[in-house]
């Protein structure tokens, strides 16, 4: 039976933080997507069809190209390997990939091969027609040899491989099987976004990512219920040697099925505008998470959140780390304990994601050496002023400069761990300077909170926050509570 309990947020955010160090090798069908938008105001006099008055046109990379675009957008490195034509569509794809910053050495443009393109025509953002230009043709011997050569050359520098099969010819006639065998020999995981009914050509892949309909077609009958999904996935695992299957289930989320265990992740989509390219986003994010150390269930949870973001966009969409982080906060909540301890750059990305979600972000700071009731009261009051609270924590060196050589009593790691475990605190950032000014400038919180022993004109960073449209709040302190006082009592042997 499928388990429905979601993974904890810590491994999800930890994996996302590692995306920047991942390189993904992407092989498959590159497609040029065109989007023509306009209005329909009359019926043609030539035939009973509407006349679309064009108002604008955009182009984007589709198919394996959209997988590459999502990987790069999420801060990782992508190496595309494919064969396209020397036509206008092919030239456009090479240019787009180069502008994106992806490597293009693995692309081969061949005369006599048509680059696939899909043109979508919409009236007021409602799609009314799709026009495809393509020729489904397997690679010839020369094209195949070139693709395998490029693949082998790039494989050593990649942590994971994606085969993006849109059935246009690149992975037909045993090419997919040969690439999978090369990956297995090299010890590299390979994920497949499959096409068609015959999954034997993907035998030995680490995982496949069919949607519910594709999964049913692969086993010869429709699947809907949880147990049907599990049975179908395990049939494919047994027949073709997959390590696991990740089945996307539209509004019902995703199922991760292995030989012995299955988990279900509920959908996170808020409002669906366009499903174009959502599967590309899912496999791109899943691959990055897996290569970043997440287990398959955690990786699927991240990919599921990513899919929920892009279906809320129009066109062949991609997403950013900030959008993905925000989606995970909606679905899994904030990180806890030590995983809420961030460096300044990670905190800045987190704050941007919170603000993107419409959440107010507060900031306070201090040494917090020996935690006492006064600290807890201050943090509780600060958190009551905002949706998310970031705590700037003086480093050990900073505390020594401010308080003297006998301080801190607790080192910065211990202090940060204790503070991060408090419900009032959403993130802790250790800073080395004597004041948090640079950190405040980097985060630009909406609300800056300090104790009432300050005045607004003496609060460090008050002018920065106010100039950015934020506000400064002074909260009452608990009388008689301080770390210095606590240390004095300990030295005197007093507990009164």
UniProtKB/Swiss-Prot annotation:
Residues 363-496 are annotated as: Cytidylyltransferase. Pathway: Nucleotide-sugar biosynthesis; ADP-L-glycero-beta-D-manno-heptose biosynthesis; ADP-L-glycero-beta-D-manno-heptose from D-glycero-beta-D-manno-heptose 7-phosphate: step 1/4; Nucleotide-sugar biosynthesis; ADP-L-glycero-beta-D-manno-heptose biosynthesis; ADP-L-glycero-beta-D-manno-heptose from D-glycero-beta-D-manno-heptose 7-phosphate: step 3/4. ATP binds at residues 211-214. Residues 1-335 are annotated as: Ribokinase. InterPro entries: Bifunc_HldE, Cyt_trans-like, PfkB_dom, RfaE_dom_I, RfaE_dom_II, Ribokinase-like, Rossmann-like_a/b/a_fold. CDD domains: RfaE_like. The active site is at 280. GO terms for cellular component: cytosol. Keywords: ATP-binding, Carbohydrate metabolism, Kinase, Multifunctional enzyme, Nucleotide-binding, Nucleotidyltransferase, Transferase. One of its GO terms (biological process) is ADP-L-glycero-beta-D-manno-heptose biosynthetic process. In the N-terminal section; belongs to the carbohydrate kinase PfkB family. HAMAP family: HldE. Catalyzes the ADP transfer from ATP to D-glycero-beta-D-manno-heptose 1-phosphate, yielding ADP-D-glycero-beta-D-manno-heptose. This is Bifunctional protein HldE. It comes from Mesorhizobium japonicum (strain LMG 29417 / CECT 9101 / MAFF 303099) (Mesorhizobium loti (strain MAFF 303099)).
């Amino acid at each position: 039976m499928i388990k429905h309990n979601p993974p904890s947020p810590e491994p999800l955010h930890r994996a996302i933080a590692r995306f920047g160090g991942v390189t993904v090798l992407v092989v498959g069908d590159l497609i040029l997507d065109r989007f023509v938008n306009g209005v329909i105001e009359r019926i043609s006099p030539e035939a009973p069809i509407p006349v679309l008055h064009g108002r604008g046109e955009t182009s984007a990379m589709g198919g394996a190209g959209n997988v590459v675009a999502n990987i790069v957008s999420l801060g990782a490195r992508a190496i595309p390997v494919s064969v396209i034509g020397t036509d206008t569509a092919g030239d456009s794809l090479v240019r787009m990939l180069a502008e994106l910053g992806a490597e293009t050495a693995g692309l081969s443009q061949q005369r006599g091969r048509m680059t696939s393109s899909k043109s979508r025509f919409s009236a007021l953002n409602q799609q009314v027609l799709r026009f495809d230009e393509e020729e489904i043709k397997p690679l010839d011997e020369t094209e195949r040899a070139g693709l395998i050569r490029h693949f082998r050359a790039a494989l050593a520098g990649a942590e994971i491989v994606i085969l993006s099969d849109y059935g246009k010819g690149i992975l037909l006639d045993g090419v997919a099987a040969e690439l999978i065998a090369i990956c297995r020999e090299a010890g590299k995981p390979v994920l497949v976004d499959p096409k068609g009914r015959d999954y034997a050509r993907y035998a030995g892949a680490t995982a496949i990512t069919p949607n519910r309909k594709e999964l049913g077609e692969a086993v010869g009958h429709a699947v809907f219920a949880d147990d049907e999904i599990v049975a179908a996935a395990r049939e494919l695992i047994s027949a073709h040697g997959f390590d696991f299957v990740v089945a996307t289930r539209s509004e019902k989320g995703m199922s991760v099925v292995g030989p012995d265990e299955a988990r279900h992740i509920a959908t996170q989509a808020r409002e669906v505008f366009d499903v174009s390219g959502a599967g590309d986003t899912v496999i791109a994010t899943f691959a990055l998470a897996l290569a970043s150390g997440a287990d398959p269930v955690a990786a699927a949870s991240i990919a599921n959140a990513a899919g929920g973001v892009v279906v809320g966009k129009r066109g062949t969409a991609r997403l950013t780390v900030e959008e993905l982080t925000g989606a995970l906060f909606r679905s899994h909540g904030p990180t806890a304990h030590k995983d809420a301890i961030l460096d300044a750059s990670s905190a800045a990305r987190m704050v941007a994601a919170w603000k993107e979600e419409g959440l107010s972000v507060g900031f306070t700071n201090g040494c917090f050496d020996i935690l006492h009731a006064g600290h807890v009261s201050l943090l509780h009051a600060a958190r009551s002023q905002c949706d998310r609270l970031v705590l700037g924590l003086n480093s050990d060196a900073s505390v020594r400069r401010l308080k003297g050589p006998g301080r801190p009593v607790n080192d910065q790691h211990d202090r940060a761990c204790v503070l991060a475990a408090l419900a009032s605190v959403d993130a802790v950032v250790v800073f080395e300077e004597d004041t948090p000014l640079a950190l405040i400038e980097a985060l630009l919180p909406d609300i800056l909170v300090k104790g009432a022993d300050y005045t607004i004109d003496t609060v460090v960073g008050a002018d920065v926050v106010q100039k950015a449209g934020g506000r400064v709040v002074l909260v009452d302190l608990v009388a008689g509570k301080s770390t210095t006082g606590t240390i004095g009592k300990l030295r005197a042997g007093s507990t009164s």
